[in-house]
């Protein structure tokens, strides 16, 4: 059998198994021939929805009776692949499916398989075929006679596939027991273990593979089935571990119901919560894409919230700076008011001192004037009664300076004193007026 025929056979078997595994999870009938059973577009659309995790955006005919209806369904499927899934499929039109063009249909499915089953493989810093090869090398590390360096050369003797099958479940067979077998026997044993233990169909012929007469793409495709079988096992084990953990918690709650006096309603609620959590875990794969979308939306909202907080912070800082500026202005005005207060208090003290001095001065002036007026009265009495003052009846005790003077001289002396006192009073009053005028300015 030439390589193209071998490759076509491998693809047909592999893709039939892949499509059926996807449709089975959706509850759809299986297909038996990829070249004919996808020709109405219905199962193809169901398959595309499930494998991509995206809802088909348009209405399509669930029971197409005519060729035109089938072509229309398939045309919508091609648009979905191109516009929504962003997958470029060259040279495949809706008519290829209706006309059962096996070669074109297999090429179409190979493109999808690479997108959703090979490109998703990652191991270290490698992906796709390189990642798959690195994964095989890591998984078979430590097995005798296994040296994974390339798909074409590293799997011809059967050791590589046998090591992968043994790594998946070491309890099924002993790896070393097949050291003495020839390459074809070892390959057939590996294919049998893979089919029975991992559910991987026999896609390759042992004799052709041992001679190197198998297309490398066939080996890549077959090897990728091991990778996904391991990943499915890991997911099952993780799910079982989660289920066991929840079952243990449920059992613990049931024991608590018997041994402790907890509220029955609360325990029932806790049990229901755990059962709900178990159901959520079972639905994890179906909801994964939706959660990722929601998470991205929340991240976008959080980023927008951060921008709003930054703007609010800048506004607050601006207001705070304005408050600091206003505070500084108020402090300056307060300092000016305090200085003015001190100046006024000093002026009030000075005015009080000046008023007290004026009061004392006026008192002295009053005393001087009283004495002078007394001398005048005495003098008038003396003129009428030279020896005594009429209102006292006592002798006049004139100032010695006045008694030695004549009458005219004494009158002049008294007039001079009165004039001096008047000058002092007038000078004082003028000073007061000048002080008031200066204060008003």
Curated annotation (Swiss-Prot):
Question: Coiled-coil segments, which residues?
Answer: 229-362, 406-430
Q: Which GO terms describe its biological process?
A: adenylate cyclase-activating G protein-coupled cAMP receptor signaling pathway; aggregation involved in sorocarp development; bleb assembly; cell morphogenesis; chemotaxis to cAMP; cortical actin cytoskeleton organization; mitotic cytokinesis; negative regulation of protein localization to cell cortex
Q: What SMART domains does the database record attribute to this sequence? A: CH (SM00033)
Q: Name one Pfam family in it.
A: Cortex-I_coil
Query: Where found, per UniProt?
Result: Cytoplasm, Cytoskeleton
Cleaved signal peptide residues: none
Q: Record's SUPFAM superfamilies?
A: Calponin-homology domain, CH-domain, Coiled-coil dimerization domain from cortexillin I
User: What's in the keyword line of the UniProt record?
Assistant: Actin-binding, Coiled coil, Cytoplasm, Cytoskeleton, Repeat
Query: CDD domains annotated for this entry?
Result: CH_CTX_rpt1, CH_CTX_rpt2
Alphabetically, the GO molecular function entries are: actin filament binding; alpha-catenin binding; protein kinase regulator activity
Q: Where is this region: Actin-binding?
A: 1-229
The cellular component terms of Gene Ontology attached to this UniProt record, alphabetical and capped at eight, are:
actin cytoskeleton; cell cortex; cell leading edge; cell trailing edge; cleavage furrow; phagocytic vesicle
Ranges for the Calponin-homology (CH) domain? 9-117, 126-231
Family matches, as InterPro entries? Actinin_actin-bd_CS, CH_dom, CH_dom_sf, Cortexillin-I_coiled-coil
User: Which family does the similarity line name?
Assistant: Belongs to the cortexillin family.
Q: How does it assemble?
A: Homodimer; parallel.
Query: What function does the entry list?
Result: Actin-bundling protein. When linked to F-actin the actin filaments form preferentially anti-parallel bundles that associate into meshworks. Plays a major role in cytokinesis. Negatively regulates cortical localization of rapgap1.
* Protein name from the UniProt record: Cortexillin-2
Source species of the chain: Dictyostelium discoideum (Social amoeba)
């Amino acid at each position: 059998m030439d390589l193209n025929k071998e490759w076509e056979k491998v693809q047909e078997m592999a893709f039939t198994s892949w499509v059926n595994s996807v449709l089975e999870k959706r509850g759809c009938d299986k297909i038996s021939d990829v070249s004919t059973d996808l020709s109405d577009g219905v199962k193809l659309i169901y398959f595309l929805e499930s494998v991509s995790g995206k809802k088909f955006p348009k209405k399509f005919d669930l029971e197409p009776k005519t060729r035109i209806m089938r072509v229309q369904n398939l045309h919508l499927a091609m648009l979905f692949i191109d516009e929504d899934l962003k997958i470029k499929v060259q040279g495949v039109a809706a008519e290829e499916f209706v006309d059962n063009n096996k070669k074109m249909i297999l090429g179409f499915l190979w493109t999808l398989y690479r997108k959703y089953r090979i490109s998703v493989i990652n191991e270290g810093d490698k992906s796709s075929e390189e990642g798959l090869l690195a994964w095989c090398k890591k998984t078979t590390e430590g097995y005798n006679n296994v040296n994974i360096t390339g798909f074409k050369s590293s799997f011809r003797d059967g050791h590589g596939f046998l090591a992968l099958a043994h790594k998946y479940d070491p309890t099924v067979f002993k790896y070393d027991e097949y050291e003495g077998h020839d390459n074809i026997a070892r390959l057939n044993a590996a294919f049998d273990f893979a089919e029975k233990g991992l559910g991987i169909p026999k896609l390759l012929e042992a004799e052709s593979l041992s001679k190197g007469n198998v297309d490398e793409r066939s080996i890549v495709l077959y090897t990728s089935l091991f990778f996904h079988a391991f990943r499915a096992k890991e997911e099952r084990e993780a799910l079982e571990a989660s289920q066991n953990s929840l079952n243990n918690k449920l059992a613990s709650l049931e024991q608590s119901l018997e041994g402790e006096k907890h509220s029955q309603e609360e325990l029932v609620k806790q049990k229901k919560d755990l059962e709900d959590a178990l159901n959520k875990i079972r639905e994890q794969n179906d909801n994964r894409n939706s959660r990722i979308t929601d998470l991205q939306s929340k991240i976008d909202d959080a980023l927008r919230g951060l921008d709003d907080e930054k703007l609010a912070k800048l506004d607050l800082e601006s207001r705070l700076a304005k408050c600091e500026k206003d505070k500084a202005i108020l402090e300056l005005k307060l300092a000016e008011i305090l200085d003015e207060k001190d100046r006024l208090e000093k002026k009030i003290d000075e005015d009080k001192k000046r008023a007290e001095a004026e009061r004392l001065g006026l008192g002295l002036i009053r005393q001087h004037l009283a004495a002078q007026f007394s001398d005048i009265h005495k003098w008038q009495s003396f003129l009428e009664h030279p020896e005594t003052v009429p209102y006292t009846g006592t002798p006049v005790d004139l100032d010695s300076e006045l008694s030695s003077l004549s009458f005219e001289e004494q009158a002049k002396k008294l007039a001079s004193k009165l004039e001096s006192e008047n000058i002092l009073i007038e000078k004082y009053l003028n000073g007061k007026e000048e002080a008031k005028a200066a204060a008003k300015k």
